Amino acid sequence: MARYSSVLPPLDLSISMGEGWTPLFLFRSGGPYYKLEYLFPTGSFKDRGSVLVMTEAKNQGQESVVQDSSGNAGASIAAYAARCGIRATVIVPRDTTEAKRRQIELYGATLEIVDGDRAAAASMALSLSGSTYYASHVWNPLFLEGTKTVAFEIWEQLGFRAPDAVVVPA
């Protein structure tokens, strides 16, 4: 993502784990292309946003962050928080997969499991945000600044032309 630093908020390269520039794979002649975002350091495109969110947390001198997630964003923030030496608490709903829970904990984050859905996890994170930095992948605009770089990459990888369409799984 450093190649796009001129159009991004500050990016601390010491926090970066080489995110960005994932392959654009042509499935067969004439398309479609697939952007292989699972090749990020934590296995998720959410690393694009996490690196900028955690750069800001580090620049502010934050000692801890909180994130609510159903898995991928929590793992990503946990990894980048560890990279920064910042404590992370990740709040997940009870139905979060065991694999995601383990990944979050392997990065050193404190895992809090709440009864209820994503909204319950978000509510708990918001309740803690007065005493810690809320590293939200939903509300923090820096997260979106990072995720937009996928558009720059696709445009560049297609020879500086826009695709006819983009399909994003929900």
PLM feature segments, named:
Residues 1-170:
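PLP-dependent amino-acid enzyme catalytic core
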